[in-house]
Amino acid sequence: MDTMNWLDQVKWDAQGLVPVIAQEAATGDVLMFAWMNREALAKTAELGRAVYYSRSRGKLWFKGEESGHVQQVHDIRLDCDSDVVLLKVTQLGHEPGIACHTGRHSCFFNALQNGAWQAVDPVLKDPESIYK
C-alpha cells in the first residue's frame, strides 16, 4: 500500500493532528485518548506499536518510553468521517494492565456520580514508582 495515499485520506485538523482512541483488543475497554500527527501515525503503522504526538512537548511520544507501558497495535481504523483514528492494542510492559500515567488501567477512571466526578477505578501502581 502506498504510504502517502492512506495518510492523505486522513482529515488532519488545522494543526496537522488527528484524535486517537486506544482500545484494548481483548476486552474492548477504552484505555486512552491522544493525538497523532502524520509522522506518528506512519511510525505506528510501521512499528506495530503506538506512537503519539505530545502537544505539550511538541514531539513524538513513543507510548511506554518512560513508563514501560508499551501498546502493541493489532489494528488501525479510521472512522466514517476520516477524522478519528481507533487503535486496537494490547497493553504490554512490566505492569501490562496499566495504560494511564496515574497508574490505572484506563485514563477514563472518573465517573459522574451525584453531580460530581468520582474516581471509580483503582490505582494499580503508584505513579511515583512508575516514573523514576
Curated annotation (Swiss-Prot):
Entry's localization field: Cytoplasm
Pfam families with a match to the protein in the record: PRA-CH
GO BP annotations, alphabetical order: L-histidine biosynthetic process
Entry binding sites for Mg(2+): 79, 81, 83
Substrates-to-products reaction catalysed: 1-(5-phospho-beta-D-ribosyl)-5'-AMP + H2O = 1-(5-phospho-beta-D-ribosyl)-5-[(5-phospho-beta-D-ribosylamino)methylideneamino]imidazole-4-carboxamide
Protein name: Phosphoribosyl-AMP cyclohydrolase
InterPro entries: PRA-CH, PRib_AMP_CycHydrolase_dom, PRib_AMP_CycHydrolase_sf
Taxonomic lineage: Bacteria, Pseudomonadati, Pseudomonadota, Betaproteobacteria, Burkholderiales
Name of the coding gene: hisI
